[in-house]
Amino acid sequence: MLAKRIIPCLDVTGGRVVKGVNFVELRDAGDPVEIAARYNDQGADELTFLDITATSDGRDLILHIIEAVASQVFIPLTVGGGVRTVEDVRRLLNAGADKTSFNSAALANPQVITDASAKYGAQCIVVAIDAKRRSDEDALLRGAGWDVYSHGGRKNTGLDAVAWAVEMAQRGAGEILLTSMNRDGTKSGFDLELTRAVSDAVSVPVIASGGVGNLDHLADGVQLGGADAVLAASIFHYGEYTVAQAKRHMASRGIPVRL
C-alpha cells in the first residue's frame, strides 16, 4: 500500500502566508520562505503553495517568491493561484515547482487541463476544487450535494463538485485537491462525506483539505474519507503540532506513512 502523504499548505497573499476561516478573516502566519524551509525540515511529504488572491486581483504569477521557496525545499512543491495557461505551467516548472494547480482557469476553459496534461504529463497537473454544500433550499430543487466555487470561493459556478472532479480526471488531471469551504479554518474536521464521494468517483489521488483541527482529523481523512493525502495549514503554522507528530499519530492508527 502506498504511503499516505501529509501536505502543509501555504496560502499566500501580499508575499505573506495567511490563514482564514471559511475563506475570509485572514490572519498573518509569516514569511513563506521561512515557513517552507521549516516544513521541509520537519519531514513534510510535499508542500502546496497557493497565491489566494492572484485570480481575483487579476495578477501574474509571483515567480520570485516561488523561486525562493523552491530553493529551500527538497520535497515536491505544488503551486497554484493565477495559473491560467499551458505557458504558465512551463514558467512555474522552470521556477522550481514540481506540480501546478489549476482552479478558476479550468472552470473557464476545461481544455487547458487536457492540453497541459498532454504536454507536461498528468503527474504535474493538479485541479483544485473549492466545494460548498448546497443549502437546504438548493438541495430541495437540485438534490443534496456540493457546488464548485471559483475566484477564491467568491463565485458559485453551479457545477456539481463530484461530476466536475470526474471530468477533470478524465481530461488528464493527475490529482484532485478538494477543499470543503464549509470546513475551511473551522478546525471541525474534513467534510468526510464530500471527500468520500469524490474519492470513490475518481481513480486519481484525492487530497483532502479544509477543516483540520487535530491529528485524528488527518487520519479520518484517509480512513473514512478515502483520501490519498491530507492537507492542513493552521494546525502546523501556529505550532500546535509538527508534521512529525502528525505522521506518528497516523502510523499509530495503522496508516502507512513515510516516517
UniProtKB/Swiss-Prot annotation:
CDD domains per UniProt: HisF
InterPro entries: Aldolase_TIM, His_biosynth, HisF, IGPS_HisA/HisF, RibuloseP-bd_barrel
Enzyme class (EC, first level): lyase
Pathway: Amino-acid biosynthesis; L-histidine biosynthesis; L-histidine from 5-phospho-alpha-D-ribose 1-diphosphate: step 5/9
Similarity annotation: Belongs to the HisA/HisF family.
PANTHER family: IMIDAZOLE GLYCEROL PHOSPHATE SYNTHASE HISHF, IMIDAZOLE GLYCEROL PHOSPHATE SYNTHASE SUBUNIT HISF/H IGP SYNTHASE SUBUNIT HISF/H
Protein name, per record: Imidazole glycerol phosphate synthase subunit HisF
Organism name: Polaromonas naphthalenivorans (strain CJ2)
Gene name tied to this protein: hisF
